[in-house]
Amino acid sequence: MNKFYIYNNFKNEALINIKVKPYSKQNLINNFVIINNIPYIKLSITAAPEQGKANEGIINYLAKEWKLSRSSIEIIKGHTHSLKTILIKNINEDYLNLIINSYIK
């Protein structure tokens, strides 16, 4: 199985790719998908993809779901696209593995 994130041990940071579906019935991580040999977490968000609402919804949902501060999550790529890369700061790799593994079925 491909690794679903890139982890930097020196900075305690991780890069995670997500595929976002806006206008969903509920905020939910739906599993994973591989696109062009790159693994993405599938994330449904209720917010509309306009004026940054979906991006804000992504940060709010992931912070709450993963028990992280909102300031530790940043969208660094794909602000106007459904395929995004997020940076998670100040996260232990063991905790990140625990989070990711909880969604693998």
From Swiss-Prot:
Alphabetical list of Pfam families matching this protein: DUF167
GO cellular component term, pick one: cytoplasm
Disulfide bonds: none
SUPFAM superfamilies linked to this entry: YggU-like
Family that this chain belongs to: Belongs to the UPF0235 family.
Protein name in the entry: UPF0235 protein RT0827
Originating organism: Rickettsia typhi (strain ATCC VR-144 / Wilmington)
